[in-house]
Regions:
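Juxtamembrane/start-of-transmembrane alpha-helix segments at the extracytoplasmic/lumenal side
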Residues: 316-335
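Cytoplasmic C-terminal tails of single-pass
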Residues: 350-352
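Long, well-ordered core segments of solenoidal/helical folds
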Residues: 12-31, 59-83, 109-133, 157-176, ...
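Boundary at the C-terminal end of the N-terminal hydrophobic targeting segment
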Residues: 8-10
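Structural signal for the C-terminal ends of transmembrane alpha-helices
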Residues: 346-348
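An alpha-helical repeat/solenoid feature that recognizes helix-turn-helix modules
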Residues: 1-6, 30-60, 78-107, 130-158, ...
Length: 352
């Protein structure tokens, strides 16, 4: 069947990545399956100014900015109309809007005030922010996202010293940080803590800078004989495979503390090796299986790691990818058909 026959095409890694992202575009101009997917996709599209992509023999790919902005505003407003407010969705909606156009002009002033008033109700007396205005418990994840909501909206963050002290109180003896004062360290909450300390003060304010640096470094796969995983970072010490997400958080975290501790070449090469030759996206191994899956989020983490290292030029390399392209198949098969026909005619003439 033409619709399922793969064809190998040579384009730049960047072009394959953009094609992959557009293959996950939805009818309402959003991308993927979550607000985060849309925010990630638009950041990459915006970086490459790929809002309209026209390639010979391929359908035009594009983002209708005004339609997407309208959709995002409606989604935020619907949350407040129903009372089902999700700060993580709000963050990603605002991030997307701000990429498309400054929030100063793209966000309705009444909606801006609704968001700001709600956020103010999540502030905790002891520092940090709770995930909802009905909760009295701050956690690292909600504090990270609410801090960044305020930052995107251009609103001041009051009591920064109090919030910084709360973040520091989540420090653990392993050098990592938990989601609150009682939880064990995780890579993600440790990164959020390091980011917040750097934003609310200076990186030297970390409870134990060396221990936190070693926490990140302990997840690095530095065995050059491990060709498949060398250069990546594990999500935890019990994991079998490095992930693009864990590598992103480790690279960003180490970069904030001491950038010289990073292995730029090894990690960049590992990231490139994660690009799928089937769909052009970047993929991770799935624990417990022998399969890999590409997604917008994994592709975004790959993009951000290369961007951090100043290595996005590596995506200019031309590579062959297997694509399911009906038009290309028709062209290829037509050429083959012509060649076969010529051979047949020559053969017939020789027989005569």
């Amino acid at each position: 069947m033409l619709s399922i026959t793969p064809v190998a095409l040579a384009k730049t890694r960047q072009s394959h990545l953009i094609d992959f992202i557009y293959s996950h575009q939805n009818g309402n101009e959003s991308f993927g399956v979550s607000p985060q997917d849309t925010a990630n996709a638009i950041e990459i599209i915006n970086y490459y100014n790929a809002y309209v992509v026209e390639i010979l023999f391929e359908p035009t790919k594009s983002v209708e900015k005004s339609a997407l902005k309208g959709y995002l505003g409606d989604e935020i407003q619907a949350m407040f109309d129903t009372g089902e407010i999700d700060i993580y969705k709000i963050y990603n909606f605002l991030e997307t809007l701000n990429t498309l156009e400054s929030l100063a002009t793209s966000l309705d002033s009444d909606l801006h005030n609704e968001i700001y008033n709600y956020i103010n109700e999540t502030v905790q007396i002891g520092g940090g922010f709770s995930p909802t205005n009905s909760s009295n418990n701050a956690n690292m994840v909600s504090t990270y996202y609410i801090y960044n909501i305020l930052k995107i909206m251009g609103e001041p963050i009051d009591n920064q010293t109090l919030h910084k002290s709360w973040v520091l109180s989540c420090n653990n003896t392993d050098g990592g940080y938990g989601g609150n004062q009682t939880l064990s360290s995780t890579l993600f909450t440790t990164y959020y803590a390091v980011y917040l300390i750097n934003e609310l003060g200076i990186i030297n304010d970390l409870a134990n800078q060396t221990a936190t640096l070693n926490y990140f470094k302990s997840l690095y796969i530095g065995d050059s004989n491990n060709l498949e995983h060398y250069g990546g970072y594990l999500p935890d010490l019990y994991s079998e495979f490095p992930l693009l997400s864990s590598t992103f958080f480790c690279v960003e975290g180490i970069g904030l503390i001491d950038e010289t501790e990073l292995s730029r070449v090894a990690t960049s090469n590992w990231v490139l090796s994660q690009q799928s030759f089937l769909d052009g996206g970047f993929s991770d191994w799935v624990e417990g299986t022998d399969q890999r899956f590409s997604s917008i989020s994994t592709s975004y983490y790959a993009f951000k790691i290369l961007q951090f290292f100043g290595s996005l030029s590596l995506l200019d390399e031309e590579v062959f990818m297997v694509e399911l392209d009906i038009l290309t198949l028709i062209i290829v098969l037509s050429v083959i058909g012509v060649i076969v026909l010529v051979i047949y005619i020559i053969w017939r003439r020789r027989r005569i």
